[in-house]
Amino acid sequence: MKSNTNIRVLLVSGLILIFIFLGIKFEFINKNNNDKIGINRKLEFSYFTKNNNNNNNNNFKQDQLKNKKDKRILLKNEIIDTNIKKNIKKNNQKNNNEEIFPNFISRLLKSNDDMEIQQFTYRKSHYIVQFKDHINDETREQFKQFLINTDIVLDEQPYQSHIVNYIPHDSFLVLMNDEQSNLLSSKEWVSWIGEFEPSNKIHLNYNEKSIGLPVYIKLSDSTNSLIQRWENTLNSILTSYNSKVKLTLINQKKLKSIVYCNDESSSQSSCSLVSSEKLVYQWISEQSESNYIERSEKFQTANRLSPKAIFGTKDTLVNNDRIDIPLRGKGQILSIADTGLDGSHCFFSDSNNPIPYNSVNLNHRKVVTYIGSLHDNEDYVDGHGTHVCGSAAGAPEDSSLAISSFSGLATDAKIAFFDLASDPSNNEPVPPEDYSQLYQPLYNAGARVHGDSWGSLSIQGYLGSYSDDAGSIDDFLYTHPDFIILRAAGNNEQYSSLLSQATAKNVITVGAEQTTHESYTTDALEYSNFETVAKSTLNSLCQSFDDKYCTYTTAQCCTEYSTVKGLSGCCTSYIKNSYASIFSSQPELYNENNICSFSSKGPTHDGRLKPDIVAPGQYITSARSNGANTTDQCGDGSLPNTNALLSESGTSMATPLATAATTILRQYLVDGYYPTGSIVESNKLQPTGSLLKALMINNAQLLNGTFPLSSTNTNPSNAVFDTFAGANFVQGWGSLRMSEWLYVESSGVKPKPSRWVGIGELGKDKKASNWKEYSLSTGQNVSYCFTYKPSSSGSNSGGIPRIVATLVWTDPPSYSGAKLNLVNNLDLTMTNTESEFIFYSNSGGSSYNGTKGTTLPLQDSINNVEGIIYTPINTKSEISFRFIIAGTNIPIGPQNFSFVFHGENGEFDWADSCMQCNPDDTQPCFIENGVGSQTCGDDYLWGRCLVQSCNNNYNYNSISDKCSKFLSYNYIVIIVAGGTMSLIITVLILIKYMEYKENGNKFSLKEFFSGVLGTGKNVSGGGKGGSGGSGSGSGTLKDGTIDDGTGIHVRPKPKDAPVTPPDLYSLLSPFIIEITISTACSLVATAASILQPYYIGQIIQDIPTTKGIGDLRDQFIIIFLLALLEFVFSTISSWISGIVNEKMVMRLQNKVFRALIAQDMGFFQKNSAAVLMNVLIVDTPMLRSSLTGILLSVSVGICKFVGSLVFIFTISWKLSLAFFATVPVLAIVTQVQSKFTKRLTRRLLFHNSKASQHGQESMVNMHVVSNYCKQDREIAKYSEQLMMVFQISRRLIINNTFAASIKWLMVESLAFIILYFGAYLAIQKQFTVGLLVSFSLYIGYVIDSSTTLFGVYSSYVQCLASATRVFLILRSAPRKRTTLEEEELDNIIDTNQDNNNNNNNDDISDSSSDDDDDNNNNKNSKNNKTKSGESDDSSSEDAEYKKNKNKRNNGKMTTKLSNSPPLVGEGIDNNNNNNNDNNINDDNNQQDPNNNNNEIDDDGDDDGDDDDEGEDENNNNNNNDDPNDNNGIEMLTEKQLRKRKRQMKKEFYKKTGISCLELNLIPSAYTELTECRGEIEFKNVSFCYPSRADVGVLYNIDLKFESGKCYGLVGPSGSGKSTLLELISRFYSLHPSGGKIYMDGIDIAKIRPSNLRSFVTNVHQHPFLFDATISENIGYALDNPTQEDIIEAAKLANAHEFIQSLPKQYDTMLTDGGNLSGGQKKRIAVARAICAKRKIMLLDEITAELDPESEEAINKSIKVLTRGHTVVMVAHKVAAVRDCDKIFVLDKGQIVEQGTHNQLMAKKGKYYRMFAFSEDDDYAPLLVL
């Protein structure tokens, strides 16, 4: 409990420290921190100039304009001069230092109760932040990061601080709190911060015309509770005004508000909506969530001959056929949103497919989707939408019909239609309040060109105002760059009368021009609805003159207009004739070169040029809707057809034609017609919306006709507001004339135009498949160069050369309340070789020649369309043109753009080279998420953009040559550390899978995880612990593994089976949770260390450009925090792993000790205690250290290796590949090293054990050594063993040192090469010095981690050496011997039964292929000849023994029982390949099982030589090198002998120094005894010791010990007396064929040994005493003995008197009994047996070595004990057995006599001969005869 508390305290303390330092970091970073800008960005242009007839380079720098730079903040409602208006208050540095940290701590410690106060104190508001210079990517990202970081510290919820919009000049509208604004004011790149006044949010008129209309509120942020909270508050305020407000959330950024009178109110007060609205919107403007408020505007709707004008040239018209207009939009989908679409009209109907309503069907011939909410596909009568769609793409299914001549322009295109809800009062459209809901489904349907012929006009008048709707449209186009929208300019005639949606920057705004004169004289008269004009006049007469006209009809007007002239205006025939007369008499006023009088004109409110283009819009004849009538109004398709056709005028009619033309243009590009005029697969291009807009504008033709401004005069269309060369506010850039460049190669009918068109660099050296539009950031520029040559003879020119360049970009949406709406400003300039002037776009011509003192021009800073039109002066010589596009101010970048150039009447082409710069000039270049730089080369071209630095949380990725975010700290921890943990878990799963495969079970992940966590495995026989838990219960698990209470389970396997990873995992499984936590902590620490070199390199990189040490504070704090993180988590990891190590060694040693204690006595006969203790004390800790060390080393090594590898590859993949060239060599060296390490480690452990064994034997037998004065001999032998250990250790050291030296040499050499090559790359500017330093540090990490990982394999090999010895003991522990081992499943028994030896046959072929599987049982095998081939019949007794032995081997004892598995005990081993562990099959040499070193070449090589090493003192055959000893090898050749020695050496390397038996499982069902009568019976019992299975001890014993009687066993030494006693106690197990022993009629093999021994006590002839008190030794057998029991037992054993004479009496400590005499030890042992009070007492020579008095006393005690007990005693003295109820006489393992003393004496047999000489002396020993 205390440990858990300490852990929690440490973890909590660590977390508090981390958060405090994070707080300090963010506070101090943002306090008085002069953040630097990585590169001083300067805009530099290079120009062609002429000086003394030489071409020199002259730089024009925009820095010259800085002194006159406009720093005003331009809002619609206010212009803020930041030079005059004061900044917000700035706390001085001292106050910042003193106040920030306490404020942070107080916030950190605030409780939830303080939340309301906190929200009030740190409530967010809108601020305007102005930057000192133009905003670039770096300063913008720094600003964003500042807001994020300070938000984390301040924990501001629910709104995040963020940038709302850009406001000119150089300012951001920002949502943040006051404390953030104070911190921000210290930034070097900030010049002014001010609060955003609520009045600047409101853009409303409160007049009767607009009052009550919906108002839209733009939101910076919103929550689900915002609307309800606002509405409740406002309605409570409006109660006194008798009005209410209804708020509706349109989306997360937009809210609709309607204020209305509360008719349900009982109040008698009047309702004033003006006052209510002022109050409501003033309150909303003061809320931090709102940022813009404007009134909703009323929406209004704004071709047989039109295509002839659109596809004509500036001078001629074309025919409306497939020759002059070959492309009609095939494969394209255009979209339209309007009042409805009459699906029954023949222009749209499909006989095979219905119109898909709210779904998409690309198989419909014309309408792929119809999206609407009215569940119809119809329009109102004479509907606007049907007419518009017909103009764009309508066409009958049968093209042969006459009506098809009135088809739309893009007849092959399909339509995606959005049905706008209509106002019932006037049929005007009502679009969705969220424009993305309109455009997104059309975009999803496949449309990429869209037309809108409707819009709204500001209620405030003709302002050309940029509304929120315009911002929404710009936003959609900005986020969908491959989409383009065309919008009608409006039909309001006046200047600045544009519809508000048409003021959007990114749309193509379409004005109206007149159509061909033919249209006026034919179609206009036929299909115009003059009835509507007449009724309008009649209505005016009704209202203005006389009520009687209210009932007039147009027919009456025609009848009476001759007498009443005023009625002519309502007569349809008169009106038609008047129009016909006017049209025919004034063709110059009615043709395609004139502007329609009604077309709305520019500019916008901020002076932007609109419209962009004009298209035919007057008397356009197209489809006519018949409303809900579903009859096809086309009839038979004949003409004229006034039911199906209608002629209308307006920009609404011009917009669909321009939309169709744009669609055809897109088809031209998508199908690959550009630039050859025919389809080329590699030329297929997916154009952006800006490119389509640029092409449309670039190829527009400025009209030079007239336009009527009023009813009394006309004006030249290019003379008014002619601000730009080639553009004005009336017609924009001119009228569409597509034929000038939309060339389609045909059969030579149409000649190739004289216009050459260039798109970016497409076609110069790039194909469409790999071409991409450029993007720019502030301070960057790009150049395009072209050449002009005069037209060659015969070329199709015939005109004046002319060039037109157009730049278009899709600008981010503007803040609607800004005075100027352009956000990103690009500028286009031109130079050429025939002029020294610099030409600026949209400036009216040349205005600057570079002369000192000349007034500098001001480039266009309000339009996102810029153009230059130039006519060469010298048309006879070649001219080079260079167009420069500069990123003047890109606050939200980078900004993509489209550049289009065309040249007329000459030969134009790309220049071979384009001089972009001066040699060695440098400029910043755009790098995503970073800053790059590029250098000008000798070819006057900018070089590759190299990463100079990356933004925070980004790093340079050399593979992609970008700044990649995945290298941020969070991603490092997640990807690398998390990936490593995943890998470790995967390996564990694989190990468990291997375990299940080895067991033959089906793998289950559920069982695996339950096994790992110790929660799911069932245990039979033990209930406290699962396989992986830490419980102390014992039991058999479902997978057959044994858990004995230590938590460590070992699966039963053959003892010599190799140790596999699942076996090793079984040792770790109880601690897997702790190890996992330790590993995870270690991985976090490693991940923190991985990132440190990156920041170190960053510091080094920033040093040259840093002004003060404070600028590096950020990086230093991060490094400190990372180091702290590494320290905390590495400490936790070390702490946990250290505890786990000790727990593991404790449990593992406990496990091994349990396995040793559970062994049968034969095991201890074959193995030295010193060797076993060596395993327990040395191998077990070594195994533990290796296991836990390997897991942690692998985890940390992989994490560090992979993490560092990611960095070095991203920094420089070239250098990384150089490093990896050495990996195979390092792997080979490690493999060779591991091979020798494995051999030498196993030999080292073996000889260490031998040395320990010899030392212990010498000290235990010190009496013998001293008695025979052999101290020097023992010293020499021990020294020899130590020398063996030293020599092997020396080889191991040499092996490891040599391998390490090779690795070190290679790695260091490689490091030098990498450093050299890295320095070269840094000099070549391929990457920076900081990156080189980081790379070098990471190389060190990689080297360190790779060395660790390679070393892990060596550790694993050493681990296997220790594991082999440990598992040899664990696997050989008998199953269910004691309560230490629990029951095994029957299927495991059956599995082991199948593995038993099957060599019990006489087949010679089987024995010849025998590989040490059976060395003892096949006596008839030819492989088992005696060494000399002599007979064994040397004596009758030997013959009898051999006979019995052969009988065993050939009789039933060698018969495999089919019903039960053989019990492999110390008797006969049926799977006894372990009885002679070191025996190598030799036809003539049956070696001693204890001989481990026969003919072993121990020099560590394979040459068969013997270096006199490795000979064991227990080896009795070490002289086989004697040339006279040819026994067994005389028939081998030299080659065979070497092969044999190599085989013997391999066997030697497998030596463990431990000899174990392969003990199979005892049947799982035990009989539990609760009481015992004490009756014992032997039936045909035969036995031999496992250490000498070829020597029998007992033969066919049949005897019975009855309860309550005393029995004696006498006979010569070695006759089997003591063995009988040990068999009763089951210290040894009988072979199933070796007879049975019964207790109370129950086979003792079926009684649990511990249960059996609870009724039996055995006193050995050699007493064993423990290092404990005398009292503890006597009471050892009882769990809680009383002092009375102990004293009574001592008295009965005649030990009480001498114990009482000792100083401490019963509390005297016995150190191995060394302070007692032999007799005293014997009496204490007897007392221990007496104290045990067992039913059966087995006494083995307990009176030996006692004086007569003591012996007599003990004999008397035994007589007392026999009452109710069964006593069996072995004795060599008459007195001990004289009074026994029955005596058994044994000789050579057989019972030769039995009876009472008198009966045996009367027989005069063996007993008599033994007793005859001691008849007079009861205490004389029996004689052995």
Swiss-Prot record:
Family: In the C-terminal section; belongs to the ABC transporter superfamily. ABCB family. Multidrug resistance exporter (TC 3.A.1.201) subfamily. In the N-terminal section; belongs to the peptidase S8 family.
SMART domains: AAA
Top EC class for this record: hydrolase
Species of the source: Dictyostelium discoideum (Social amoeba)
Enzyme Commission no: 3.4.21.-
Membrane spanning residue stretches: 971-991, 1071-1091, 1116-1136, 1189-1209, 1210-1230, 1304-1324, 1327-1347
Keywords of the record: ATP-binding, Glycoprotein, Hydrolase, Membrane, Nucleotide-binding, Protease, Serine protease, Signal, Transmembrane, Transmembrane helix, Transport
Catalytic residues as annotated in Swiss-Prot or TrEMBL: D338, H384, S652
Protein name (database record): Serine protease/ABC transporter B family protein tagD
GO MF annotation terms: ABC-type transporter activity; ATP binding; ATP hydrolysis activity; ATPase-coupled transmembrane transporter activity; serine-type endopeptidase activity
Positions contributing to ATP binding: G1611, P1612, S1613, G1614, S1615, G1616, K1617, S1618
Glycosylation (residues): N629, N704, N781, N849, N896, N1018, N1295, N1424, N1580, N1715, N1755
Pfam families: ABC_membrane (PF00664), ABC_tran (PF00005), Peptidase_S8 (PF00082)
Residues spanning the signal sequence: 1-26
Compositional bias of kind Acidic residues: 1403-1415, 1495-1514
CDD domains the record matches: ABC_6TM_TAP_ABCB8_10_like, Peptidases_S8_Kp43_protease
Topology of this chain in the membrane: Multi-pass membrane protein
Low complexity compositional bias, start-end: 1388-1402, 1465-1494, 1515-1529
Keyword Disulfide bond listed: no
Start and end residues of each ABC transmembrane type-1 domain: 1075-1358
